[in-house]
C-alpha cells in the first residue's frame, strides 16, 4: 500500500508553517547549564508543552482542518485519540467553526477528556483493550458523512507536526542529533523532513517506551509491525503500529528508533520540574530520556530535544514527582 502513497516533503512542512502561524504558538527553546554540563554538549529543548492545548498536536490538526473544503467543514470531522490529538482537533475545529466528534479511550487522562469537551468536542468513549477505534471511526464517519482526521497517518497532519522542528532549526541552527518522541510517527516523520532540509547530516532518533516498541521492531524488520496496546505511563505513545505515511518517511529519513523505561521517564519528568521548572507529561520525556542514556556518544555535539507536550493530570503528576 505504501508504494502508492504520495509522501509529503519539506515544502509541505514550510507551507504548513505559513498556514498555522496566525493561531499556533512559536514555542520557546530552552537550554540548561546543568544539562550541558552533564552531557558536555550543547542541548536545546523545543518546548511544545507551551503550544496551544499543551502539545505539538495542535500544529498538525490545524494544518489538516485548514485544508478541508466547504462541504467537509459543514459536515464536520471525526478523530480517535488518547488525548492530545483529541484536544488539538477539538480546539482547531472550534477556531475554524467546524463540528467535531472524538473517539477517546475510557482510561484516557481525565484532564485530556475534560479539555477536549471544554473545547467543544463531542466525546465518544471506547475500551482500548477490547474495541477497534479505527473500525468505530469508519462506521460513524460513513453513517454521518464526517471526514476522518487520524492522529498521525495523514500527510497534512504530519506536515504540520514538522513545523516544530523547523522552528527549532531556524532558531538554533544546524544540529548533530535530534531526539523525537514516537507514538504513531507523526512528529517523528515531520521532524525528519525538517531535519533533512536544515541539517542533512543530523542524526534523527525516534524514542518509544520499552513496552511499546512497535516502531523499533518495524524499523528493523523493514515493514510495519502491530503489537497489543502497551502498558506504559507514556499514554501518548500507546499506539499499536506506525502509519503507512509515517513509516514510509521514517524508514528513509530516520537513523534509529530507541526505547526507554518508565523509570527513566519518571527521572526526566522530575528533572524537568526540579531543574528546568517546566511541566512535561511522561510521553514528552521520551526524547530526553533516550539522549541521557547515550550522552557519552553525544559529547561536544549540538543536540535537539523535542518535548512533545505537558498534558498530565495534576494528581498523577504529583504521584510521579513523589516516586
From Swiss-Prot:
Stated regulation of activity: Allosterically activated by ATP, by magnesium, and possibly also by other divalent metal cations.
InterPro entries given in the database record: TrpB-like_PALP (IPR001926), TrpB-like_PALP_sf (IPR036052)
Residue numbers binding pyridoxal 5'-phosphate: 84, 183-187, 308
Residues noted as binding Ca(2+) 2 in the record, renumbered to the chain: 208, 212, 214
PTM section of the record: Modification of the active site Lys by its substrate Ser to lysino-D-alanine reduces but does not abolish enzyme activity.
Coiled-coil positions: none
Cofactor requirement: Mg(2+); Mn(2+); Ca(2+); pyridoxal 5'-phosphate
Origin superkingdom: Eukaryota
Enzyme Commission no: 5.1.1.18, 4.3.1.18, 4.3.1.17
Annotated signal peptide: none
Keywords: Allosteric enzyme, ATP-binding, Calcium, Isomerase, Lyase, Magnesium, Manganese, Metal-binding, Nucleotide-binding, Pyridoxal phosphate
Reaction(s) catalysed (UniProt annotation): L-serine = D-serine; L-serine = pyruvate + NH4(+); D-serine = pyruvate + NH4(+)
Any GO BP annotation: D-serine metabolic process
Positions of post-translational N6-(pyridoxal phosphate)lysine modification: 57
Membership in a protein family: Belongs to the serine/threonine dehydratase family.
Function: Catalyzes the synthesis of D-serine from L-serine. Has dehydratase activity towards both L-serine and D-serine.
Protein name: Serine racemase
Protein's organism: Schizosaccharomyces pombe (strain 972 / ATCC 24843) (Fission yeast)
Amino acid at each position: 500500500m505504501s508504494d502508492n502513497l504520495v509522501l509529503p516533503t519539506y515544502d509541505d512542512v514550510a507551507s504548513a508553517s505559513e498556514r498555522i502561524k496566525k493561531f499556533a504558538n512559536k514555542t520557546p527553546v530552552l537550554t540548561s547549564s546543568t544539562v550541558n554540563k552533564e552531557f558536555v554538549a550543547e542541548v536545546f529543548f523545543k518546548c511544545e508543552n507551551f503550544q496551544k492545548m499543551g502539545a505539538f498536536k495542535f500544529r498538525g490538526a490545524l494544518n489538516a482542518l485548514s485544508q478541508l473544503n466547504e462541504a467537509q467543514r459543514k459536515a464536520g470531522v471525526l478523530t480517535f485519540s488518547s488525548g492530545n490529538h483529541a484536544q488539538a482537533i477539538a480546539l482547531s475545529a472550534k477556531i475554524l467553526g467546524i463540528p467535531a466528534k472524538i473517539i477517546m479511550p475510557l482510561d484516557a487522562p481525565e484532564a485530556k477528556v475534560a479539555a477536549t469537551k471544554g473545547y467543544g468536542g463531542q466525546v465518544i468513549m471506547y475500551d482500548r483493550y477490547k474495541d477497534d477505534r479505527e473500525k468505530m471511526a469508519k462506521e460513524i464517519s460513513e453513517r454521518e458523512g464526517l471526514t476522518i482526521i487520524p492522529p498521525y497517518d495523514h500527510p497534512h497532519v504530519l506536515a504540520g507536526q514538522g513545523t516544530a522542528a523547523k522552528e527549532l532549526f531556524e532558531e538554533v541552527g544546524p544540529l548533530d542529533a535530534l531526539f523525537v518522541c514516537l507514538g504513531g510517527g507523526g512528529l517523528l516523520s515531520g521532524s525528519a523532513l525538517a531535519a533533512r532540509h536544515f541539517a542533512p547530516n543530523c542524526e534523527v532518533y525516534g524514542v518509544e517506551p520499552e513496552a511499546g516498541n512497535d516502531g523499533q521492531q518495524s524499523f528493523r524488520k523493514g515493514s510495519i509491525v502491530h503489537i497489543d496496546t502497551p502498558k506504559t505511563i507514556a499514554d501518548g505513545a500507546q499506539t499499536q503500529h506506525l502509519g503507512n505515511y509515517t513509516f514510509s518517511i521514517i524508514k528513509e529519513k530516520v537513523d534509529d528508533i530507541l526505547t526507554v523505561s518508565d523509570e527513566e521517564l519518571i527521572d526526566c519528568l522530575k528533572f524537568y520540574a526540579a531543574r528546568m521548572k517546566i511541566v512535561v507529561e511522561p510521553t514528552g520525556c521520551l526524547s530526553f530520556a533516550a539522549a541521557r542514556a547515550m550522552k557519552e556518544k553525544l559529547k561536544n555535539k549540538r543536540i535537539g530535544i523535542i518535548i512533545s507536550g505537558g498534558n498530565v493530570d495534576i494528581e498523577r503528576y504529583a504521584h510521579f514527582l513523589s516516586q
